[in-house]
Amino acid sequence: MPTLPGSLTLVKGIKPQPLVSLANFTSWRVGGPAEWFASPSSVEELQTLIAWAYEQKMPCRVIGAGSNLLINDTGLPGLSLCMRKLQGSDLDPKTGIVEALAGEPIPNLSKRAAKVGLHGLEWAVGIPGTVGGAAVMNAGAQGGCTADWLESVQVLDLNGEGPFELSRQELDYAYRQSLLQEKTLVVLSARFRLDPGHDHKELNQITQQNLTHRTTTQPYQLPSCGSVFRNPEPLKAGRLIEALGLKGHRIGGAEVSPIHANFIVNIGGATAADINQMITLIQQRVQMAHGVMLHPEVKRLGFEATA
């Protein structure tokens, strides 16, 4: 196990902790321990931690808010970084420019924008994740997505380079995809250009309607990662799964939600292995019945190479 340099212990709050269970930091509530774990509360702390991992020649992973991750029960080697403390945002009601740190919850930003008459993020009110995660995954709902409104991101390279800016055009956005998923880059912050001058009451109403729709049509009462599979446009993954009668199907503590078939929920005592097995089962069944291979939205860490 690597040793901690004295410089890290001098900066309050950033000393990495050994063997921390990652189940407490994922929305599925599963996953083994991180070899080293830290939750930076500033960009400077994050840079220090990334530099330490690079010097130690260890893997370094950002787990964001853990809402779109499945982490193996055996845990993860190297340094795992939780971004939940890296919060903050600045909204300009006149220009529509919004700056937000990577750990800022995207639902909070959606609500704040609506309150000051900025249109563009109403769809994001029910997304269980952070600004950084939304930028990486091109998160979307209700007919909107991150790429529609994001102008640029500030990133660091895990090799120690940066920070530097990437424009929306440079991010190669597509449905639930971006360049950020392929590179060793960590999102520090994002800039959005929203549409100013709207009636805040109307935007608040739309935001509330979107939230109500999501909470009544999706299983918010149990731990999940949100939608498991990308929609194979123009088809819907949930409908393909439901057509096979898989709603309510269980493997250990993992269940295909009876409310929405594109959600796998932890009904209690689930393991990452249970959930991973369920993902594979659904892929096999759907391909056999419909001739369609479903590709997960969720990122699986610590597993063998998967589709």
Curated annotation (Swiss-Prot):
Cofactor needs: FAD
Pfam families in UniProt: FAD_binding_4, MurB_C
As for what it does, the entry says:
Cell wall formation.
Q: EC annotation?
A: 1.3.1.98
Supply the name of the protein.
Answer: UDP-N-acetylenolpyruvoylglucosamine reductase
**Which stretches are transmembrane?**
none
Its annotated pathway?
Cell wall biogenesis; peptidoglycan biosynthesis
Q: Which organism is it from?
A: Prochlorococcus marinus (strain MIT 9313)
The FAD-binding PCMH-type domain extends over 29-197
Tell me which family the UniProt entry assigns to this protein: Belongs to the MurB family.
Which residues are the active-site ones? 176, 227 (proton donor), 297
